[in-house]
Amino acid sequence: MTEYKLVVVGAGGVGKSALTIQLIQNHFVDEYDPTIEDSYRKQVVIDGETCLLDILDTAGQEEYSAMRDQYMRTGEGFLCVFAINNSKSFADINLYREQIKRVKDSDDVPMVLVGNKCDLPTRTVDTKQAQELAKSYGIPFIETSAKTRQGVEDAFYTLVREIRQYRMKKLNSNEDGNQGCMGLSCIVM
């Protein structure tokens, strides 16, 4: 069974835990209890493949920002979550993305941009804005509601698909790099 290490990042109060718990336990938590760090595991079938999702739900509060580098190192893919009724959380997405790229030492990291709380009528971040940001990053964008479950599975499953593509790309580039060697080792003296 293939394991995928997913990390849920974003500002405090955007619904990272609510999304994760909705996926894992099929239930909505509506009281706000700031997370320090929680880990969840769930076996699912995505595109006919049985997968083990290892999901790290992270702290959005600034006082826990020192912990971010560590979990960003271990994560394979990232759900970058903002709340559609919180423009600051949307602006913060770039900070998370830049930190992920720095820690991973790569511009090519599997990510999905997630606009949560789409069930609320008080939108301050336009869907088009988010779509344009995701397009500029070259990543998918999905609107979700942890309350109604809209888009929840889609967000996590899309991230798994992004990780799969990334793994295949790395595998293919490694194979391409080895073609000229014909399995022989070279020593430079």
UniProtKB/Swiss-Prot annotation:
GTP binds at residues 10-17, 57-61, 116-119. GO terms for cellular component: Golgi membrane; plasma membrane. Residues 187-189 form a propeptide. SUPFAM superfamilies: P-loop containing nucleoside triphosphate hydrolases (SSF52540). Belongs to the small GTPase superfamily. Ras family. It holds the Pfam family Ras. The gene is NRAS. Palmitoylated by the ZDHHC9-GOLGA7 complex. Depalmitoylated by ABHD17A, ABHD17B and ABHD17C. A continuous cycle of de- and re-palmitoylation regulates rapid exchange between plasma membrane and Golgi. Keywords: Cell membrane, Golgi apparatus, GTP-binding, Hydrolase, Lipoprotein, Membrane, Methylation, Nucleotide-binding, Palmitate, Prenylation. PANTHER family: RAS, DI-RAS, AND RHEB FAMILY MEMBERS OF SMALL GTPASE SUPERFAMILY (PTHR24070). GO terms for molecular function: G protein activity; GDP binding; GTP binding; GTPase activity; protein-containing complex binding. GO terms for biological process: positive regulation of endothelial cell proliferation; Ras protein signal transduction. It catalyses: GTP + H2O = GDP + phosphate + H(+). Its main location: membrane. It comes from the Eukaryota. It is an enzyme of class 3 (hydrolase). This is GTPase NRas. Residues 166-185 are annotated as: Hypervariable region. It is a lipid-anchor. It comes from Gallus gallus. The keyword GTP-binding applies. Alternates between an inactive form bound to GDP and an active form bound to GTP. Activated by a guanine nucleotide-exchange factor (GEF) and inactivated by a GTPase-activating protein (GAP). A motif (Effector region) lies at residues 32-40. It is found in: Cell membrane; Golgi apparatus membrane. The keyword GTP-binding applies.
